[in-house]
From Swiss-Prot:
This protein binds to 23S rRNA in the presence of protein L20. Keywords: Ribonucleoprotein, Ribosomal protein, RNA-binding, rRNA-binding. This is Large ribosomal subunit protein bL21. GO terms for biological process: translation. GO terms for molecular function: rRNA binding; structural constituent of ribosome. The lineage of its organism: Bacteria, Pseudomonadati, Pseudomonadota, Gammaproteobacteria, Chromatiales. It comes from Nitrosococcus oceani (strain ATCC 19707 / BCRC 17464 / JCM 30415 / NCIMB 11848 / C-107). The keyword rRNA-binding applies. GO terms for cellular component: cytoplasm; ribonucleoprotein complex; ribosome. Part of the 50S ribosomal subunit. Contacts protein L20. Belongs to the bacterial ribosomal protein bL21 family.
Length: 104
């Protein structure tokens, strides 16, 4: 069984037992959270598609850790002016462990 969920403006395909990194969620480490924006749930023989979400569809997950991703380096350059600007960015993430998928 797998599901497609939406969190942080992105969509993820998850199964029970998966570990994935999503945009930062304000929850304590070790806490259990419920993701209720479920777009699709599929078994071996049955597929449910929401319009836009499945009524009563829920995915339970445990927050494993919080952190910051790899650094992305940006260089802006103005040609012929000897002007350069270097910047970097590290995005915050939350690592989740998927415990249960239910259709309601």
């Amino acid at each position: 069984m797998y599901a497609v969920i939406k969190t942080g403006g992105k969509q993820y395909r998850v199964q029970e037992g998966d570990t994935l990194r999503v945009e930062k969620i304000n929850a304590d480490e070790g806490a259990t959270i419920t993701l209720d924006e479920v777009l699709l749930v599929a078994n071996e023989d049955n597929i449910q598609v929401g319009a836009p979400y499945i009524e009563g569809g829920k995915v339970s997950a445990t927050v494993k850790t919080h952190g910051r991703g790899e650094k992305i380096r940006i260089i802006k350059l103005r040609r012929r002016k000897h002007h350069r600007k270097r910047m970097g960015h590290r995005q915050y993430f939350t690592e989740l462990h998927i415990d249960n998928i239910s259709t309601g």
